[in-house]
Amino acid sequence: IRDSHKKYDIKILNFSVGYLPDSKLTEKQKILDVIDELWDLGIVVVAAAGNYGPGPFSVTVPGISRKIITVGSYDDFRSGRGPTGCCIVKPEVLAPGSEILSLSNRNNGFVRKSGTSMATPIVAGAIALLLERYPKMKPEEVKLRLYNTCKRIPSQKDRNWGIVDVDKLLGIISVSYTHLTLPTICS
């Protein structure tokens, strides 16, 4: 990915996989280190929250990384939920994740799938459109804009920022900005 980033100017990485909760800690740490390095290189990393919810602390690696954008499904009860072990609110953003039409090598080439791996490309695609419009944006700026444009869900303010709102994200609807401080819910 590092080589392709330089060669093709890759700006975004969709990571629709997660490590199983019982995976070795060293394996999890290696992927977290790589994901954080990619973010620091200027690649917006968008990762699935995993499908081990709905209980707390159920977001999978790499979605627990403080730096990256973690996506949950607002219409799938299995969607991973935070906080993380470091008390970070995760996932940050939600998108549709149930009965999404996807590709298959059977059933005439299509199948309906559900989970955060289906929600994550929706957010990654919205961010790709944003980066097409504003190609100089840094990952932190993308995350701030996402934070300021999500459709808030008052009943879930301690669990996420809200649902991705593509019109607001792209500036089609005006937005007021606030400073981003990653919320925590632990004392």
Question: Positions of the model-derived regions?
Answer:
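Substrate-binding/access-modulating region of protease and related hydrolase catalytic domains
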Residues: 1-65, 87-88, 105-120, 158
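Extracellular S/T/G-rich loop segment that most often corresponds to the catalytic His/Ser-adjacent loop
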Residues: 63-132, 136
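Active-site proximal loops enriched in glycine and acidic residues that flank catalytic Cys/His/Asp
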Residues: 17, 49, 72, 82, ...
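Single conserved hydrophobic/aromatic residue that forms the stacking wall/gate
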Residues: 179-187
